[in-house]
């Protein structure tokens, strides 16, 4: 298996395992086994478990950046692309739910996923403001908060909304759409 392919496979397997089980419950050996390689190869590519986590989170930030920056720049289109990315990459959803809810302290560390997503969103807000796709009457900080709240609000609340709707014995096609906004 070529090195780049092996590295990507290991990273994808780690993303899936970390999302399903939690990073603290997944060993480098488990990642290696599920990837069909040796622990030495995982260490060769990522150095340590922290290096592997950082690589996993870099992939998530890259996917977010792509969703926000490709296509029309209006808010509704950006939000739809983020939700589409979540639908296409459920392992990212699992990872974000677990890391942001189970380990908010780690997510907010200097190399944590939340810290990097906030920085990426700030960059995107600046680009959108310069291109006229975001208003300048609101602060950058407010726009970053709104952007992440719209994305994560749906991400975190969707399982509860689905469960409640199921308890009400209503057909899925009549379920109201979930939207999250700050006022």
Enumerate the predicted regions with their spans.
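A detector for short, charged/polar N-terminal pre-domain segments
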Residues: 1-2
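Alpha-helical DNA-contacting segments of helix-turn-helix folds
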Residues: 53-60, 117
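An amphipathic alpha-helical core segment
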Residues: 145, 149-157
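C-terminal peripheral helix-coil segments that are non-catalytic and often amphipathic
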Residues: 84-87, 118-131, 156-183
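Hydrophobic alpha-helical connector segments
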Residues: 55, 65-98, 120, 140, ...
């Amino acid at each position: 298996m070529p090195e780049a392919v092996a590295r990507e496979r290991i990273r994808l397997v780690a993303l899936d395992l970390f999302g399903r089980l939690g990073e603290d419950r997944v060993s480098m050996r488990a990642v290696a086994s599920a990837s069909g390689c040796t622990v030495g190869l995982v260490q060769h590519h990522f150095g340590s478990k922290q290096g592997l986590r950082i690589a996993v989170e870099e992939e998530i930030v890259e996917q977010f950046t792509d969703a926000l920056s490709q296509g029309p720049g209006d808010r509704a289109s950006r939000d739809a692309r983020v939700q589409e990315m979540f639908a296409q990459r459920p392992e990212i959803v699992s990872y974000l739910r677990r890391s942001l809810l189970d380990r908010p302290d780690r997510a907010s560390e200097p190399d944590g996923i939340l810290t990097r997503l906030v920085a990426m969103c700030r960059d995107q807000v600046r680009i959108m403001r310069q291109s006229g796709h975001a208003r300048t009457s609101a602060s950058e900080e407010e726009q970053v908060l709104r952007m992440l709240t719209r994305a994560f609000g749906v991400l975190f609340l969707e399982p509860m909304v689905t469960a409640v709707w199921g308890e009400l014995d209503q057909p899925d096609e009549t379920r109201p759409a979930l939207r999250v906004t700050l006022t």
